[in-house]
Amino acid sequence: MAAGGFKEFVAGETLDQDEINDYLMQGMLVFANSAARTSAIASPVEGQFSFLKDSDGVEFYDGSGWVEYSGAPPLFDFLVVAGGGAGGSRLNRSGSGGGAGGYRNSITGELTGGSATAEPSLFLPSGSFTVTVGAGGTGGAPSTRGSESRFAQILSYGGGKGSGLDAGAVYSAGDGGSGAGEGGDAGGIGRALLLQGSNGGTDIFDAASGGGGGAGVVGGNSTGVVSSSGTGGAGGAGLSSSITGSAVTRGGGGGGGARNTGGAGGTGGGGAGAGGAGTGSAATVNTGGGGGGSGYNTSGAGGNGGSGIVVIKYPDSITLTIGGGLTSSTATAGGFKTTTFTAGTDTVSF
């Protein structure tokens, strides 16, 4: 009967029976199977450990029976992107670009929101947790911010709404995961919350608005010297992640609208801003991109924000039970499972 512990003896030292049993109790006893263990240990003591070769499992005696020892809770990596804010819509002005949804990433070597170093992975004990995929904001006057996404205690804030003007009421650029751009006289840029993204860009005059902030880069400022030749600010760029096995960029800000030329949508699904009297472009679904701002002097709405996404990566020994309110898919590779949630909210257990 082998033991995992050891003692270094000195010349002349002896051990009595009780001391031998004490040392064996502190070691890891190795057996072919549970039957061999029962034969060897007729009266196990609480706290005693053993290793069974047939199952490659470690068990401990809890005072009434042998219990599998699972060690530390499993480690989950995550990418949690909230819904992007919608672009703004402004009569006699141009609408600003919506901000990207908050972006939180734990993959080593990649970046999280605001181009910061990736967050730590998350230990989760067996049980249940909530997953929510945030919807994108809706373009209009006023437009709306994106909705939050969640994985357990990891929460990403929705992107800020673009600035707007409706029936004389001015709606300022919204704060959010990433902030919306500034539009005309609507009170400044939207700002990123808790380092989950970037601030929006500024405008230089009322006919060309700033771009929404992206997950990785601040929204662009509008440019030009007179209102008739202005260009809306480009949406800020998003960030790339390979958590699914392929590099995908998400979290682009929406482009600002303008009297002349709308700003480009940010890399990572941001919608383009409109020029002239056009309607802002919608962001790409499941990127958390911001919607593009509307053009000048138009009743057209800003573009809708893109819905968010939640991706988790965990050991392939774990099997998740996913509630029916979630839309998901799972792939297995290299000893890990990767589950991607694209819509809904519900409880997940394992």
Predicted regions and their residues:
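Short, intrinsically disordered N-terminal pre-domain segments
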Residues: 1-22
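Extracellular/surface-exposed low-complexity repeats and stalk/linker segments enriched in Gly/Pro
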Residues: 15-49, 53-55, 70
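Bacterial Sec-dependent N-terminal signal peptides
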Residues: 3, 58, 82-86
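Tryptophan-rich substrate-binding surfaces of secreted polymer-degrading and adhesive proteins
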Residues: 63-71
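Surface-exposed loop/turn positions
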Residues: 13, 45-48, 127-128, 308
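A generic structural motif
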Residues: 55-56, 345
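Low-complexity, glycine/proline-biased repetitive segments and flexible coils/loops
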Residues: 75-350
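Short beta-strand segments and strand-loop junctions that repeat across beta-rich extracellular domains
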Residues: 56-64
